[in-house]
Amino acid sequence: MIEDIKTLREEHVYRAKLAEQAERYDEMAEAMKNLVENCLDQNNSPPGAKGDELTVEERNLLSVAYKNAVGARRASWRIISSVEQKEANRNHMANKALAASYRQKVENELNKICQEILTLLTDKLLPRTTDSESRVFYFKMKGDYYRYISEFSNEEGKKASAEQAEESYKRATDTAEAELPSTHPIRLGLALNYSVFYYEILNQPQKACEMAKLAFDDAITEFDSVSEDSYKDSTLIMQLLRDNLTLWTSDLQTQEQQQQPVGEGAEAPKVEATEQQ
């Protein structure tokens, strides 16, 4: 029985890798979902027992699969929403209604995928996690997918999902700051995406800048001790943090320069932040 589970687990991993190479991310996500649901804790073993958690490779495959499955639809949602707004501005209400219907279809797909991975994280993965790195990784993922839900939800739904995202990011940050070095790529990626959450969802650009700058400065201070394995990933994420800081600082300065009496000024356009892929 145990040998059968091991073979099945290896098959799911191989299917996920095949799907990744073919850029068929929905099927990649399905393979990893099947692995999580059917290949963990099959021997009624206690949490933390060998085989009860995802390996680093499996964890990364899961992340890549759902990130890309959601990412394609997030891009579609932005395009369709823009078209819908343009049709409304032109008073083409029939076209606007068609665009709105299509947008709703994409939102339903987005919500389904986000809820699916959130269920896996909450019910299957986090309860079995015993090491700090995986705990940070999974709570960061929870924050990310609640953030994605916030992007397309109505006001009430946005508030609820933003609160869940905030809680998840906070729990990830508490563990990361206590257990992981400031140069660790997972800790840096968490700071990157958490700061994007403050900028794009909570509309707190000053807080986003402070968070990104603190993570960057802390990593610079300890950069001499970065491990060889982490060097490439850490430097890449630090560059993304710096890029966002540059964009956000410029945006804040522009808004300050454009400040005028109420009713006379226009809101400065938002720059789009970069998050960890």
UniProtKB/Swiss-Prot annotation:
This is 14-3-3 protein. Residues 252-277 are annotated as: Disordered. Residues 267-277 have a biased composition (Basic and acidic residues). SUPFAM superfamilies: 14-3-3 protein. Belongs to the 14-3-3 family. InterPro entries: 14-3-3, 14-3-3_CS, 14-3-3_dom_sf, 14-3-3_domain. It comes from the Eukaryota. Pfam families: 14-3-3. Transmembrane segments: none annotated.
